[in-house]
């Protein structure tokens, strides 16, 4: 049965799931949700995600929401040799590193990066004024996070594992994609290993396909 993804291609959370599907080489049907028209608050959608947020995924009788839960589900249920990039590690030392850095992305990087993306990207789309104080505060916070990333990436090619792209890196892609088009780009470029890592993961075909779907919307 075909996997169905309900979401908005401009949503960072939806993009996270799309990248995972493309990395796993899985066929899926994309069901666009018109959030401007309140599609995410309709009863039919709330049956999939009671919080009225995108995305939601249907895999036969299984229904999921929360983007990181969905990417983990896809990675663990489709971890076979012919199903694209593994995205996870099962050896305990590598698994430990991956689990730690997944939490770092969710609790250290994402809150700060999301505020910056809102101020520097999405507010402009909605005709709202950027709060420069919020931008300055969060640029300083992001710089500290990226200092930790720089140290990590001096000893590891990727954040979650030494030599392989995992969910850790994947989860960063949507916000990186937006922030690299703003003044915040300099914070990434000032750190050599962080800059190289960004260029590497943003060049992945899965991300290019995700952007292509966004342009079609």
Curated annotation (Swiss-Prot):
GST N-terminal domain ranges (all copies): 2-82
Q: Which SUPFAM superfamilies match?
A: GST C-terminal domain-like (SSF47616), Thioredoxin-like (SSF52833)
Disulfide bond residue pairs: none
Query: Which Gene3D superfamilies does the entry link to?
Result: 1.20.1050.10, Glutaredoxin
Q: Which residues form the GST C-terminal domain?
A: 91-217
Chief location of this protein?
cytoplasm
What InterPro entries does its record include?
Glutathione-S-Trfase_C-like, Glutathione-S-Trfase_C_sf, Glutathione_S-Trfase, Glutathione_S-Trfase_N, GST_C, GST_Phi_C, Thioredoxin-like_sf
Indicate the enzyme's highest-level EC class: transferase
GO MF term list: glutathione binding; glutathione transferase activity
Assigned keywords, A-Z: Cytoplasm, Transferase
Cellular component terms (Gene Ontology): cytoplasm
Spell out the coiled coil positions from the record: none
* Compartmental location: Cytoplasm
Which GO biological-process labels does this protein carry? glutathione metabolic process; toxin catabolic process
The protein's job, in short, is:
Conjugation of reduced glutathione to a wide number of exogenous and endogenous hydrophobic electrophiles.
Q: Which family does it belong to?
A: Belongs to the GST superfamily. Phi family.
Please state what the protein is called: Glutathione S-transferase
Q: Which organism is it from?
A: Silene vulgaris
Q: What is the lineage of its organism?
A: Eukaryota, Viridiplantae, Streptophyta, Embryophyta, Tracheophyta
